[in-house]
Amino acid sequence: MKIKIALFITALLGSTLAVSRVHADMQDDVDRAVSIIERFSEIPETAIPPAVMRDAKAVAILTVTKAGFVLSGRGGTGVVIARTEKGWSGPSAIGTGGLGLGFQAGVQVSEYVIILNTQEAVNSFAKGNNVTLGGNLSAAIGPIGRSAEAAVAPQAALYTYSRSQGIFAGVSLEGTVIATRYQQNEEYYGKPAFPSDIFSGDIKPPSGAQKLLDVLSKY
């Protein structure tokens, strides 16, 4: 019985990671991030308030795939970009993954935008260590729409936004662990690229990141 369970988990993780590998190329993640930011800004009633974007110290954008039945596997990739004195930094590759319990039949793809509201949050990502949402840093579902424009100071270090199958929903990411993908950074920049060096602006963003920087520069 134990062998069957082990084989099931292995197969489950394999299928989830196989889907994740579709997004393994960092340029794909960068291009996808552009589309995600645009989608999260389309409808005023469900959009991330411009004020939240303007005050953001950094922005993380992820595409996460969940697959399985009873036991579910989750894997996702994306990028995080920090605000500098001269604009926005280049992107740093990130990823997440794990197992969960509960009814999860088939495959579900979700998009997430995480707003980093504090310098402490940026520093946590800059160190290149694993970041646990709601653990290392307080996280809350972010405000949406025009009514949130008048919001005062952020209520958490991180604001999270999610979109699944075309529907915007407030989904807590508490407990999610996000890790730096060092190999993807090195391949994208053509040399070892530590998150802190990317966020400081010391490493020039590749030309492929320009469209993402242009979209974010509106805020």
List each model region and its residues:
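Bacterial N-terminal signal peptides that target proteins for export
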Residues: M1-F8
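N-terminal hydrophobic alpha-helix used for membrane targeting or insertion
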Residues: I9-G14, V107
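C-terminal segment of classical bacterial N-terminal signal peptides
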Residues: L13-R21
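Small-residue-enriched, tightly packed secondary-structure blocks
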Residues: H23-Y219
